[in-house]
Regions:
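A conserved beta-turn-beta hairpin within the catalytic core of GNAT-like acetyltransferases
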Residues: 64-74, 84, 134-139
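Conserved beta-strand in the GNAT
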Residues: 49, 55-65, 71-78
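Conserved acetyl-CoA pyrophosphate-binding loop and the N-cap/start of the following alpha-helix
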Residues: 83, 87-95
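Conserved GNAT acetyl-CoA-binding A-motif
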Residues: 93, 100-113
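Short amphipathic alpha-helix that is part of the acyltransferase structural core
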Residues: 1-56
Length: 142
């Protein structure tokens, strides 16, 4: 998988559409969670895109410290359902963490869906609070 990092203004219309389509496919349709994915934060985020051939297969967005939380943060971690089981989730997160390290982001906050706790602890994240519900889905601050 090839990864690239782009600001919101660097995303061409077709690429932005692919990002929003993937996020909607997983976070709204697959997880049966009606919520507003377009939250007004994409403009401040940096977008980590993972491609196989010319198809977007994985994605995250990352915020510098102070743009979302006090620390930097990674969110909207998603892998296309048709491309799961190929370690793309780990690859996109490792690319996101490498970018954060290169930018000297010393602390990263995530809000992880609880069923993915092991995935995130294997990447070095630790629990930092109680479990909570976000849009009806159990989450864990890390």
């Amino acid at each position: 998988m090839k990864t690239t990092v782009k600001s919101f203004s660097e995303l061409p219309t077709q690429e932005l559409y692919a990002v929003l389509q993937l996020r909607s496919e997983v976070f709204v349709v697959e997880q049966d969670c009606v919520y507003q994915d377009l939250d007004g934060k994409d403009q401040k985020a940096l977008h980590i895109l993972g491609y196989e051939q010319d198809q977007l297969v994985a994605y995250t967005r990352i915020f510098k410290p102070g743009d979302y939380f006090e620390q930097s943060s990674i969110g909207r971690v998603v892998v296309s359902p048709q491309h799961r089981g190929k370690s793309y989730g780990q690859e996109i997160m490792k690319a996101s963490l490498a970018f954060a390290k290169a930018e000297n982001y010393t602390s990263i906050k995530i809000s992880a869906q609880c069923y993915l706790d092991k995935f995130y602890t294997d990447l070095g994240f630790v629990f930092t609070g109680e479990k909570y519900l976000e849009d009806g889905i159990p989450h864990q601050a890390m």
